[in-house]
Amino acid sequence: MISDESDRFNPRDPKPADAGKPSKSAKRREARKLATQALYQWHMAKHSLNEVEAQFRVDNDFSDVDGAYFREILHGVPAKKVEIDEALKPCLDTPLEELDPVELSVLRLSAWEFMMRADVPYRVVINEGVELAKVFGATDGHKFVNGVLDKLAPRLREAEVRANKR
């Protein structure tokens, strides 16, 4: 039998074109991180969204970031702020105004994803929110965020949550 040498692995061959490039989910994770920081800045400094976005695009390397998703979050969360806050209130034991601004930014981003991005599974939304709170929030902020998002998911994604509990 004749073997086909061309099908064998050759360590001297160049890597595939996409080797070492971040995946779509990794780029979205980076977009969420930057969006959390940008939403915090928008909330605290009261700059316009366009100013915040421009500053973030100048100050950060977007090569490993889903820039379109960053922009969608950054402009989408404030556009839905009233609806997001109304959805969050029944899941909180504390008034919104008393929440840590970082955790509030994470909760708003996650609530926006629940509402506007049905293509992102609810468990991914919760996990990403918890991870953002671990990176940017207070010591146990991720536990608080997890608890709120666990209450919020069935309110905003009832059918999906029910289907996943079977």
UniProtKB/Swiss-Prot annotation:
It comes from Pseudomonas entomophila (strain L48). Gene3D superfamilies: NusB-like (1.10.940.10). One of its GO terms (molecular function) is RNA binding. Keywords: RNA-binding, Transcription, Transcription antitermination, Transcription regulation. Residues 1-18 have a biased composition (Basic and acidic residues). GO terms for cellular component: cytosol. InterPro entries: NusB-like_sf, NusB_fam, NusB_RsmB_TIM44. Residues 1-30 are annotated as: Disordered. The lineage of its organism: Bacteria, Pseudomonadati, Pseudomonadota, Gammaproteobacteria, Pseudomonadales. The keyword Transcription regulation applies. Belongs to the NusB family. The keyword Glycosyltransferase does not apply. This is Transcription antitermination protein NusB. It comes from the Bacteria. Involved in transcription antitermination. Required for transcription of ribosomal RNA (rRNA) genes. Binds specifically to the boxA antiterminator sequence of the ribosomal RNA (rrn) operons. GO terms for biological process: DNA-templated transcription termination; transcription antitermination. Signal peptide: none annotated.
